[in-house]
């Protein structure tokens, strides 16, 4: 069972239009740029769950929009019963549906309050949300005055290893240690001095007596006296407090302790009725010796005491006997090296496979986290052209099964940290190689000129070199009509028609399936380098000289094309030298028409002018 769908309206980014986010399964990564709506989804999940730990910090009521204001969540059973958790199996066994409920969002003393769920408590009583917000403080949670997260870890281990005596044994040991402190001579001397003064002061009315005692040893006390330490070596003596430890490793420790504190809910459903064999029970009762009334009363009192203690422990514990845990982690990449980010994702994915009662949802800005995931686990949150937040599940790509399988295979192969950055982009440029990316960004700066808004656009533009000729991947992944993950995506590709005019170019048939409003090709004829020559002949000639190469005479589009047809190995050296010269002469270069049109369309959707115009800056 897992959280499948979140719908929120009248709150933050959903104030103008509802936000619907669907999740692929028990592991999912929600990614998107700043301001796309991820925080709205995160807080909607937290507000929707009545049973959450730790408590969500108060949210200012200005986050509320016009009515209606509510959040609706829907859980779903696993498609394969082999991967169903204990709670899901129990509900299915009783013929019940997966939980779903709705909560209104209300104002309360200037804060946002989630109202009473509009469903029976049976729907959500066994669902637990563990929320690690972006503004979490691991040092406070693990080592300060109220480290309750450690207490949940102790309770989880008590369930797993009851033979240790659990928290009851730990409290007894702590109480014995504290009581021994009061017998110390120093404490006795202080106690006598205070008691004498109090007797003198209070003797005129009613004499009182003072004693130095210790705190009541309960679970709250245990939460205060424990703290986590971190060491580089497996030696307790070398452990250091978290305040002086690496922030990245403290963040990892926080996640590790939180997950370890989730007890095992079991792998089999809890039976509806306890399997008691009455006959065997009667026979056992007959064979037992008859106890006296006093012994029976004493045994009954002990049972009642144990039952009351167990009830108190259950009330204090966050997790019931049968539950499903939804773990929401915001920005787990905080302070983490990319290698640690990759390992974290792999570990969490393994955890979800091993423990069917846990679902992990993460939100991130990290391309490294996205690269470590399977494409079908990714959810992209973005703004559409109307500034409404939309959520796209990659697994729902509306393509044929064979084509989608092919695209996902290529995505798994190519989705490294560099390419996964494309999933965060609003506008994206696709090129074949890294040299094209470098040259085109420089031409973009020349195109922008002194326009500060255009300069900012070029500097932040995501340029993705795919390392091969631009094909269906990644355009069909990012810009399939009706399922766009970007606002606009442009591809600069070569026609490779060395002896034919540009009008003879025949793009593949699949180009027609792209939405012309969101995806376009711009052609370099016949390749990028020759298409840059017109108006930049002197610069191109200087680039040949910088590479110690003999420039063709004269330098024209045709001669440069023929040169690289016969000397393809010199292309890389030439491109690097040309990029350096462009960077040094931005004010005097000519931007080719197809490149100028490409940047203008990416920038604001402007259509090319009826007559070609080269931007000379």
Feature locations, PLM:
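Electropositive, glycine-dotted interaction segments
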Residues: 72, 78-176, 188, 192, ...
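Walker B catalytic acidic pair
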Residues: 330-332
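H-loop/switch region of ABC-family ATPase nucleotide-binding domains
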Residues: 363-365
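Pre-Walker A-like glycine/lysine-rich segment at the N-terminus of P-loop NTPase domains
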Residues: 1-47, 63
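Pre-Walker A adenine-sensing motif
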Residues: 9-20, 313-317, 414-417
């Amino acid at each position: 069972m897992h959280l499948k769908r979140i719908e929120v309206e009248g709150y933050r980014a959903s104030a103008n239009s509802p936000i619907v986010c669907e999740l692929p399964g028990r592991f999912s990564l929600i990614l998107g740029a700043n301001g796309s709506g991820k925080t709205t989804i995160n807080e909607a999940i937290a507000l929707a769950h009545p049973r959450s730990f730790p408590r969500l910090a108060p949210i200012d009521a200005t986050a509320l929009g016009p009515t209606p204001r509510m959040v609706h969540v829907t859980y779903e059973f696993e498609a394969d019963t082999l991967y169903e958790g204990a709670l899901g199996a129990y509900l299915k066994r009783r013929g019940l549906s997966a939980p779903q409920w709705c909560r209104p969002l209300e104002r309360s003393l200037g804060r946002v309050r989630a109202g009473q769920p509009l469903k029976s408590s049976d729907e959500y009583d066994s669902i637990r949300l563990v929320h690690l917000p972006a503004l979490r403080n691991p040092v406070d949670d693990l080592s300060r005055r109220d480290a309750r997260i450690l207490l949940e870890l102790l309770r989880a281990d008590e369930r797993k290893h009851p033979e240790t005596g659990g928290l009851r044994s730990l409290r007894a040991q702590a109480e014995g240690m504290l009581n021994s402190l009061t017998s110390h001579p120093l404490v006795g001397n202080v106690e006598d001095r205070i008691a004498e003064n109090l007797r003198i002061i209070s003797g005129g009315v009613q004499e009182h007596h003072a004693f130095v005692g210790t705190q009541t040893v309960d679970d709250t006390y245990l939460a205060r006296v424990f703290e986590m330490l971190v060491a580089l070596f497996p030696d307790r003596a070398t452990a250091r407090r978290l305040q002086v430890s690496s922030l990245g490793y403290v963040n990892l420790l926080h996640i590790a302790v939180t997950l370890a504190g989730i007890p095992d809910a079991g792998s089999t459903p809890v039976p509806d009725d306890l399997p008691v064999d009455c006959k065997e029970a009667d026979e056992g009762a007959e064979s037992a010796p008859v106890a006296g009334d006093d012994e029976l009363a004493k045994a009954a009192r002990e049972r009642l005491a144990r039952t009351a203690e167990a009830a108190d422990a259950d009330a204090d514990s966050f997790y019931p006997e049968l539950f499903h845990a939804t773990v929401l982690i915001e920005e787990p990449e905080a302070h983490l090296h990319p290698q640690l980010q990759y390992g974290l994702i792999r570990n969490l994915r393994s955890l979800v496979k091993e423990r069917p009662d846990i679902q992990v949802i993460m939100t991130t800005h990290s391309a490294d986290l996205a690269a470590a995931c399977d494409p079908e686990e990714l959810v992209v949150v973005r703004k559409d052209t109307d500034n409404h937040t939309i959520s796209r599940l990659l697994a729902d790509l509306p393509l044929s099964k064979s084509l989608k399988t092919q695209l996902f295979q290529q995505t798994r192969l190519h989705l490294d940290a560099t390419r996964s950055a494309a999933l965060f982009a609003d506008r994206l440029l696709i090129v074949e190689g890294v040299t094209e990316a470098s040259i085109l960004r420089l031409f973009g700066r020349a195109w922008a000129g002194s326009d500060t808004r255009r300069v900012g656009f070029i500097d932040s533009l995501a340029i993705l070199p795919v390392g091969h000729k631009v094909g269906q991947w990644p355009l069909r992944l990012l810009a399939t009509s009706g399922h766009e993950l970007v606002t606009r995506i442009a591809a600069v590709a070569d026609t490779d028609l060395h002896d034919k005019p540009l009008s003879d170019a025949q793009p593949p048939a699949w180009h027609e399936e792209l939405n012309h409003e969101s995806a376009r090709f711009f052609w370099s004829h016949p390749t990028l380098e020759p298409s840059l020559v017109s108006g930049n002949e002197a610069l191109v000639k200087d680039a040949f000289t910088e590479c110690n190469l003999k420039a063709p005479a004269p330098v024209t589009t045709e001669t440069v094309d023929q040169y690289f047809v016969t000397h393809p190995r010199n292309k890389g050296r030439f491109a690097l030298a040309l990029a350096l010269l462009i960077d040094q002469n931005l004010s005097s270069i000519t931007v080719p028409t197809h490149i100028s049109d490409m940047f203008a369309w990416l920038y604001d959707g402007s259509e090319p002018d009826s007559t070609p115009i080269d931007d000379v800056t």
